[in-house]
């Protein structure tokens, strides 16, 4: 699985003019299931993100997790994270999981992150979404599992 994790002051996702998910201080997690991914990868990614220490402690060091700060996560599917740009000028996405499997793994991942104790809201898989965020730091982490 592939994820782009952003520490945010707030974030929201809108579909057809309606906010379908939002968070205050916490994480925006853009996530892509890759071909061959399954529940094991989703479990590992959820556990890692829940404990990822990218929030400042009292000394100003990145030493606290989203769980430690009582934050939440907005999880948004984004198959374009699978882009292959090595050849030509048009990205290829053949390394992404097929849509039905990608949706299943995406939903499973969001549920597993919530099971770790992180309040989770989500976007809508496959929809044309508008994502707004205020990146805090900025802190942006690329993660492959």
Swiss-Prot record:
Transmembrane segments: none annotated. Its EC number is 3.1.1.96. Homodimer. GO terms for molecular function: D-tyrosyl-tRNA(Tyr) deacylase activity; Gly-tRNA(Ala) deacylase activity; Ser(Gly)-tRNA(Ala) hydrolase activity; tRNA binding. It comes from Ruegeria pomeroyi (strain ATCC 700808 / DSM 15171 / DSS-3) (Silicibacter pomeroyi). GO terms for biological process: D-amino acid catabolic process. HAMAP family: Deacylase_Dtd. It is found in: Cytoplasm. Belongs to the DTD family. This is D-aminoacyl-tRNA deacylase. The gene is dtd. A Gly-cisPro motif from one monomer fits into the active site of the other monomer to allow specific chiral rejection of L-amino acids. It holds the Pfam family Tyr_Deacylase. The keyword tRNA-binding applies. InterPro entries: Daa-tRNA_deacyls_DTD, DTD-like_sf. Its main location: cytoplasm.
């Amino acid at each position: 699985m592939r994820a782009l994790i952003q520490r945010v002051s707030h974030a929201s996702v809108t579909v057809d003019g309606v906010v379908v998910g939002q968070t205050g201080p916490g994480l925006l997690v853009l996530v892509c299931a890759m071909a061959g991914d399954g529940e094991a990868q989703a479990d590992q990614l959820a556990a890692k993100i829940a404990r990822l220490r990218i929030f400042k402690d009292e000394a100003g060091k990145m030493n606290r997790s989203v769980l430690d700060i009582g934050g939440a996560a907005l999880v948004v599917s984004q198959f374009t994270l699978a882009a292959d740009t090595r050849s030509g000028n048009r990205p290829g996405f053949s390394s992404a999981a097929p849509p039905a499997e990608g949706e299943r793994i995406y939903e499973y991942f969001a549920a597993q992150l919530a099971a770790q104790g992180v309040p989770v809201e989500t976007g809508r898989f496959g929809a044309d979404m508008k994502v707004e965020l205020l990146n805090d730091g900025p802190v942006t982490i690329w993660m492959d599992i």
